[in-house]
């Protein structure tokens, strides 16, 4: 996606794929190349609002899971954006993206910890209910060892996630 200065604003052209809430979001933050010669320092961030001329919703993806939010293509066809919708200064978009990703990765880690905790709890229930050789398989040393390793790994991941969040809060 490119953004070209035009009078008192910008004109965006291009498209973005796999955008969460691409067909329903009222406000979008869009990264666009404003100066190709500067590489990553030539990317800028813009705020776009649904209904702006030239801002179009493209194909909605038929996803296997995570259907609570739609994922779709967003298309920009000579989409005029006021200069006041530039976030920060021209060329800061790549750095802004990295800062957002840093925080987002902590959230993704937390989701992973929750999923791992749920899997561990399901395994605990199953090994308590499933009987073999006249007793619950959860009482067998080999099964107990694997469950203990899983519990330790989940707790290690939880603590690493907490530490990452704490470091982010400390500005590190």
Whereabouts are the PLM-identified features?
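Short, intrinsically disordered, charge-balanced linker/junction segments flanking boundaries
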Residues: 168-172
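Glycine-rich beta->alpha junctions and the first turn(s) of the following alpha-helix
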Residues: 52-156
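A generic structural signal for beta-strand entry/edge sites
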Residues: 7-11, 27, 71
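A short core secondary-structure module
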Residues: 13-57
């Amino acid at each position: 996606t490119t953004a070209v200065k035009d009078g008192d604003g910008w004109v965006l052209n291009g498209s973005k794929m796999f955008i969460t809430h691409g067909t329903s979001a009222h406000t979008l933050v869009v990264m666009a190349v404003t100066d190709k010669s500067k590489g990553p320092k030539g990317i800028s961030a813009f705020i776009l609002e649904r209904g702006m001329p030239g801002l179009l919703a493209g194909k909605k993806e038929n996803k296997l899971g995570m259907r609570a939010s739609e994922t779709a293509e967003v298309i920009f066809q000579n989409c005029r954006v006021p200069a006041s919708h530039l976030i920060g200064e021209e060329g800061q978009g790549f750095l802004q993206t990295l800062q957002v990703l840093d925080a987002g990765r902590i959230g993704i880690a937390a989701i992973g910890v929750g999923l791992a905790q749920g899997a561990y709890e399901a395994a605990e229930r199953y090994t308590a209910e499933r009987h073999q050789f006249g007793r619950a398989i959860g009482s067998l040393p080999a099964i107990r060892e694997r469950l203990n390793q899983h519990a330790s790994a989940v707790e290690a991941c939880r603590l690493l996630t907490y530490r990452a969040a704490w470091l982010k809060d400390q500005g590190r």
